[in-house]
Design a protein with these regions (language model features):
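Hydrophobic/aromatic-lined pockets within catalytic cores
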Residues: 29, 101, 169-173
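Hydrophobic alpha-helical interaction segments
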Residues: 141-217
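C-terminal intrinsically disordered extensions
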Residues: 24, 121-152, 207-208
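Short coil/loop linkers at secondary-structure junctions
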Residues: 30-34, 103, 207
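Short gly/ser-rich loop at a beta-strand->alpha-helix junction or flexible surface loop bordering the NTP-binding
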Residues: 50-61, 67-139
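Short beta-edge/loop segments at beta->alpha junctions of small alpha/beta modules
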Residues: 2-85
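Residues that recognize and position ribonucleotide moieties
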Residues: 17, 89, 157
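A residue-level signal for conserved active-site and pocket-lining positions in enzyme catalytic cores
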Residues: 24, 96, 164
Length: 217
């Protein structure tokens, strides 16, 4: 039996599509396959697709033929983060605004706020670009909408109030003026619960709370 056939059959029997290097290595050891050669061969033939380093999606024969896979890019991101041990994360900033239909702009990247890592440049996952922004753990305790897909995979995004506060907070960290933050808040003031916004602001530096209060009048 060819390597790819054995590998694909083995994971199909396990109903496992998303796997780690350790998962693949274990099956290679079972069949006596060289791990490195097997991995490279599967990649070169388009069966093994990288989500993150050491985390992959394994296409079956039908997916390879049709070009259609079981999961969406957001689902692959979610599962990849889970396997990397990133428990706290959500789609935020402009990405959250888009998901809530609060903007009609089209953005080149999706913003993923998380507890573990920053990336200066976007990371491409299956044709979509994601920019990872690290924030402090205390900012994961409120304002996050948690949904589950038809494939039972969690997808998180910030609500409108938290989204604006995150934007204001990151604006401030990047050196933007208070006037820029006020302009941002005023633009979306009609789309948020002002009491919730003020309450959430207690979790951010006091300067943010003062600017929010000024923007709301």
């Amino acid at each position: 039996m060819k390597r790819k056939d054995a590998i694909i059959r083995e994971f199909s029997l396990k109903k496992k599509k998303i796997l780690t290097s350790d998962d693949l290595r274990a099956v290679c050891d079972k069949y006596g396959f060289d791990f490195g050669r097997t991995k490279i061969g599967l990649m070169n033939k388009g069966y093994l697709l990288t989500i993150f380093r050491g985390i992959y999606y394994l296409r079956d024969f039908n997916e390879k033929k049709t070009g259609v896979i079981k999961y969406s890019t957001d689902e692959l991101l979610s599962e990849g983060l889970r396997l990397k041990g990133v428990g706290n994360w959500y789609f935020g900033l402009n990405t959250a605004l888009k998901r809530m239909n609060l903007t009609h702009e089209i953005f080149a990247v999706d913003y993923v706020l998380n507890e573990r890592f920053n990336r200066v440049r976007p990371m491409e996952i299956f044709g979509s670009n994601f920019l990872f922004v690290k924030i402090k753990p205390s900012l994961f305790s409120f304002g996050i909408e948690k949904t589950t897909t038809a494939n039972d995979i969690p997808i998180n995004y910030s609500d409108a109030e938290k989204t604006l506060l995150d934007m204001a907070y990151l604006y401030r960290l990047s050196g933007k003026s208070g006037e820029a933050i006020i302009s941002l808040i005023e633009e979306y003031a009609g789309d948020v619960d002002k009491k919730k916004l003020i309450n959430y602001a207690k979790n951010y530096p006091k300067t943010i709370g003062k600017i929010i209060a000024e923007a709301l009048g």
